[in-house]
UniProtKB/Swiss-Prot annotation:
Function summary: Catalyzes the base-exchange of a guanine (G) residue with the queuine precursor 7-aminomethyl-7-deazaguanine (PreQ1) at position 34 (anticodon wobble position) in tRNAs with GU(N) anticodons (tRNA-Asp, -Asn, -His and -Tyr). Catalysis occurs through a double-displacement mechanism. The nucleophile active site attacks the C1' of nucleotide 34 to detach the guanine base from the RNA, forming a covalent enzyme-RNA intermediate. The proton acceptor active site deprotonates the incoming PreQ1, allowing a nucleophilic attack on the C1' of the ribose to form the product.
Protein's organism: Escherichia coli (strain K12)
The protein's name in its UniProt record: Queuine tRNA-ribosyltransferase
A Pfam family of this chain: TGT
Organismal lineage: Bacteria, Pseudomonadati, Pseudomonadota, Gammaproteobacteria, Enterobacterales
Residues spanning the membrane: none
Amino acid sequence: MKFELDTTDGRARRGRLVFDRGVVETPCFMPVGTYGTVKGMTPEEVEATGAQIILGNTFHLWLRPGQEIMKLHGDLHDFMQWKGPILTDSGGFQVFSLGDIRKITEQGVHFRNPINGDPIFLDPEKSMEIQYDLGSDIVMIFDECTPYPADWDYAKRSMEMSLRWAKRSRERFDSLGNKNALFGIIQGSVYEDLRDISVKGLVDIGFDGYAVGGLAVGEPKADMHRILEHVCPQIPADKPRYLMGVGKPEDLVEGVRRGIDMFDCVMPTRNARNGHLFVTDGVVKIRNAKYKSDTGPLDPECDCYTCRNYSRAYLHHLDRCNEILGARLNTIHNLRYYQRLMAGLRKAIEEGKLESFVTDFYQRQGREVPPLNVD
């Protein structure tokens, strides 16, 4: 993988990730394909929304179908028939989400398989091996996603262990002869001094890109913005920056304003299945009775398959009848909305008009522009 940086507007960056499998224009949003599928969508439909890279989930694919089944097909690209690049998370977030059924040690994490209750152990080395078998174009180190809230002492211990695990991840990745990209993950909760230590430690080890982890886990938005404003300038300018698990459309806008290049989140697909649809002027909750006789398109400014062909009344009808097609059409629209948003941000950065784009984005939704505390 090669990262090319074209231009900046304030702290926002316009560039691209170049892979053997294709080029990804940045800033970018990566749809989440947890089990080797973006829920309800064929790879061709995902690509048609404008997505150039997707995310797969190491933890879930390790449990089902497992490494051996994956290797029978070649790798994850062959298994799911996605032709473009794939980023896989390390499994750390899912393991730490298991709560009481897991035990963290210096060596790794002991837990019970949530499917059948069998005892399982996952460590940095195993995570690198699974992601190698998946053929991931971007591999994420194995780390502990520090929960929120966490006091300073806990956050410090967690961050320091994640640094040690980052070194082990790097060593196993290299010993496997993996020619793809490996990203480090910056931790430290909401504490700037801990984030400083994490960034420096990861840069000293050396990675192909750097993710900001441990945000969007319940902390106030002001804390997320503050940490991004503090951390992003410390990440080497020639490396891509990835904000993990984020987020709402406004979170993508605010991340880009602060220098983030890559995002992923289940929100557009999950919300689509619940009838919560993103449009230029805000949100449409399609199961609301007021849409029963609305013959207009979901979003008049959207060019997706759903908006070009179907009315709000039809989408409302499908939702009320729990029809699978409704979830699919909603997902197509939400994913296209996110890709159109990212394309708009990229164009605005190219033209040096980002703040004008941001102002218009919020005004269309009747909201104030959040403050930006950068030099």
